[in-house]
Amino acid sequence: MIKEKIIFGIDRKEISHFTSIELQQTINIHHTFAIKVPHSVIEKPRAYTMENAQNWLGKVVHIQLENKNNFLGIITNIELDFNLDHVGSQIILTGFSKTILLESGTKMHSWEDTTLQDMVREVIKSGANEQLQNEIQPEFTHKINYQTQYEETDFQYIQRLAKQYNEWLFYDGEKLFFGKPKNIREKERIALTFGQDLYTFKLGVKAKQTQFGAFTYNEDYNKLYKVQTQNKVEGLPRLGDQTFEASEKLYNTTSLEYGRIPTGDEGFLETILKKRQEAAMADANYITATSGNNKLKIGSIITINAKEEIEVNSAHRLGLDATKTNFQTQEVGTYIITEITHKATDIGEYENSFKALPAFIKTLPEAQVAFPQAQNQQAIVIDNADPKGQGRIRVKMQWQQTKNLRTQWIR
């Protein structure tokens, strides 16, 4: 579909021509892009090496698909593609969203009595300085007694925290969100009509394991807490509720595992498991589609409509002019986009394909990231005067000794 001009620039300078752009955006992970630029845009004719293009490596790329739909990324790879066909030789630029700034190597760090918000903000500031816009507003606001970043990159650690506490995590093209955006329900809804700007459309449901059980041990009070999820998930549409019921019958036993985070009471553990259940069911009802609307991006709220021609007899009954073609519109549902791929060409062609979930789900699907596995480590005991008289100690691991860090009270 021919759309308004797509603007593409590098290091704050607009590039006059491009051959094609492909941008893949998904919640919980880095976005990726591939841009083809004619060889002649920056290199001399008959140049068989890079004389200028290599200077783009590590630079910020800006793609403006529409006035309010921008993408900022980092170029991490450049190739010269020599070709004798009608397209000619190309410079191929590939890279990631600016979240890639948080992948500068695995790290080890620890925090005591700190909120999730403060931890994530500190990690982003340390890894990306002021280069990555962010909005960090997690629902979990309690102080956390002790938390460790353990042989994880900054982004892997943020992914793991999002999974551990079932917080929203996504990059909207310009800003990284950790926690559900406060104005998500007030966002402008974008209407898409099947047969107009919505080219193909699939609606699906899938059975999911929905019943979770967990236990934790509170060593301060020598008490074991054990809970399991209930048979209700909020925020699902009719199809989601029916999918939940079918899933319960299919997977009719409850899992049991050690709680992902330490809790002080059963009510707290129940809340955490409820959010995990919401995350599991978030994509049980979904849609996939292709569209020509270049306003769409991760986090967009869309309303899907189906437009049908009204038969002549029905037009008469409705008091419509039967000599004209009349249409009626039926609303299919309201959704939030969680995956989208944009494709554009230099002649103004544009199309996207996307996946979307029911708009009012409470929690996004979990990030697919593994929890770190701890190993035996050497440590120095720095305190054995347990204020609660329970025989606990504090230690410094070797990696904590240069950072003035320490563990919590441990046995």
Roles of regions detected by a PLM:
Residues 1-411:
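Amphipathic alpha-helical and helix-coil boundary elements used as assembly
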